[in-house]
């Protein structure tokens, strides 16, 4: 049995308003949540304060992105200092939508990781291949390069969670089979052992994202190297509670 605490992040993406999020938060607050699982809710920037005020203390709050410096003339951006000021303690960085919709590079993501960690904000660092890359047989090459860009900027791994999200399985209804997901998670752990340290490889949580639902979570969560989930669409529904409790 792994000593790594199960970690479930809900990425609300650009969804919700105060009315619908209040309903969701009330459902989460009244739900029976496993004490053995760390739960983080990724709210839209404009609702970080709102989410932190309304969610019970057993839930942490995460931003979905931040910039690589503390302040300045960067219109539309937010800093880790602002995230903390809202009572949030995590940030999602390198999500495939940031990479592929907004053109963020490995280098920029690495710089963001370094700055967030220097400000003591926890990082959920996302990696994952696109369908054409998987079909070309370069899944490992892609995810190792993305992981290296993150790892090169990490001094203290206790504040980092890695999220493997095969891009072809995000919001598509396609899910990597538990075996496919486990295979990549195992390879990532081996990469960490070789390139960072055995201790980090054993302790860092590697979570899975990509169309995780109440129906798929138990089998995925049973894999030895899958330490939780980063959940998109299903995190806005009551079934998020089932996903949080996947190990029960």
From Swiss-Prot:
Principal location class: cytoplasm
Coiled coil: none
GO CC aspect terms: cytoplasm
Protein name: Triosephosphate isomerase
GO terms, molecular function: methylglyoxal synthase activity; protein homodimerization activity; triose-phosphate isomerase activity
Catalytic residues of the enzyme: 95 (electrophile), 165 (proton acceptor)
The organism's place on the tree of life at top rank: Eukaryota
Amino acids binding substrate: 11, 13
Listed NCBIfam families: tim
Gene3D superfamilies attached to this UniProt entry: Aldolase class I
Catalytic activity of the protein: dihydroxyacetone phosphate = methylglyoxal + phosphate; D-glyceraldehyde 3-phosphate = dihydroxyacetone phosphate
Record has Calcium as a keyword: no
Keywords assigned by UniProt, alphabetized: Cytoplasm, Gluconeogenesis, Glycolysis, Isomerase, Lyase
Pathway annotation: Carbohydrate degradation; glycolysis; D-glyceraldehyde 3-phosphate from glycerone phosphate: step 1/1; Carbohydrate biosynthesis; gluconeogenesis
Similarity comment: family membership: Belongs to the triosephosphate isomerase family.
EC number: 5.3.1.1, 4.2.3.3
Record's subcellular location: Cytoplasm
HAMAP family listed in its UniProt record: TIM_B
Any single biological process term in GO: methylglyoxal biosynthetic process
Organism: Xenopus tropicalis
InterPro entries: Aldolase_TIM, TIM_sf, TrioseP_Isoase_bac/euk, Triosephosphate_isomerase, Triosephosphate_isomerase_AS
Subunit structure: Homodimer.
Reported function: Triosephosphate isomerase is an extremely efficient metabolic enzyme that catalyzes the interconversion between dihydroxyacetone phosphate (DHAP) and D-glyceraldehyde-3-phosphate (G3P) in glycolysis and gluconeogenesis. It is also responsible for the non-negligible production of methylglyoxal a reactive cytotoxic side-product that modifies and can alter proteins, DNA and lipids.
